Each structure stands twice: as structure tokens, then as C-alpha cells.
Regions:
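Donor nucleotide-sugar binding/catalytic pocket of nucleotide-sugar-dependent glycosyltransferases
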Residues: 118-127, 136-150
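Extended catalytic core of nucleotide-activated donor transferases of GT-like folds
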Residues: 7, 14-132
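Nucleotide-activated donor-dependent transferases that construct or modify glycoconjugates
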Residues: 1-11
Length: 150
């Protein structure tokens, strides 16, 4: 994959994580599109997003279902989730226990599909929970928390 879409704003710590990941992606030569969750210019940003992605070259990295929560701007006029329409895989790093996201996990399964959805858990117990209660989840991984140095 050559391109990644990340989200800024929302929860402060998650925005920080996105910013740090963006730096690493850029260092690796991956183009980054930063979607501002608090923008007033939604239509312009969606137009730019559509110009940015290329099927087979783009993926989304998000935290706690940002971009997968049913935000109107990410659906086309027929109600199809843009990520599904463009076949953009979504890597969702879930930092809270997954039982908080039962409804969103159902939404993802129905609207995106399990082939395009990758869930990363930051706790081994969260990963065990996912494997037990969501066996239909094809892509589930553990990634320990990292740190930054200043």
C-alpha cells in the first residue's frame, strides 16, 4: 500500500497517535491524507479524499472506529460506505475494551464487511475477547502500546 488515510481531532490522545503514525508513514515513503473530523468544509475535504485514494494502494488507519461510526460524510448518495465502495481496507486500533463497541462492530460487519476490516487490540485480553465473541472477524491482531521520546 502506498497511501494511508488518518483522522485528526476527536479525542486528543487518539489525534496524537494519528499524528505520530503519520510521521512514520511519511518517513517510509507512504503518502498520508489527514481527514479533519472537525472541519466545516466537509464537501471540499471529501472531494480531496476521493482524489487521494486509489483502489489497491490506499488503506485507512483509525482509532476507536473514527470514520466507521456512521458519519454521514463517509456514505455516498445510495448509502454505501465510501471505504467499501473504493475497496479501502480499514485498520482500526481499538484502545478501549471491545465490549463497548458491540453496535459498531455489527455496523462494520454489515456496511464494510469483514474482508476489508482489520482490528488491532492493545491488550491481549481484548484480543481474546474478539476471538471468542467475534469469530467471523478475519483480521484481528495484538499490538502493544508504544511510547514516544522527546
Amino acid at each position: 500500500m502506498q497511501k494511508v488515510i488518518v483522522f485528526e481531532h476527536g479525542v486528543e490522545t487518539l489525534a496524537f497517535f494519528s499524528k505520530e503514525l503519520s510521521k512514520c508513514f511519511k518517513e517510509k515513503g507512504i503518502s498520508v491524507f489527514v481527514y479533519d473530523l472537525e472541519t466545516k468544509e466537509v464537501k471540499k475535504q471529501i472531494r480531496n479524499l476521493r482524489k487521494f485514494w486509489k483502489p489497491g494502494e490506499t488503506f485507512v488507519v483509525t482509532f476507536n472506529f473514527n470514520g466507521l461510526r456512521g458519519e454521514d460524510c463517509f456514505y455516498d448518495k445510495d448509502g454505501v460506505l465510501l471505504w467499501k465502495y473504493a475497496k479501502v481496507p480499514c485498520v482500526n486500533i481499538v484502545v478501549d475494551h471491545p465490549f463497548y463497541y458491540y453496535g459498531l462492530l455489527q455496523k462494520v460487519e454489515e456496511e464494510l464487511g469483514m474482508e476489508l476490516y482489520y482490528q488491532i487490540s492493545i491488550d491481549r485480553d481484548h484480543e481474546k475477547f474478539m476471538k471468542r465473541f467475534y469469530p467471523q472477524l478475519k483480521h484481528s491482531f495484538f499490538l502493544p502500546l508504544a511510547g514516544t521520546r522527546y
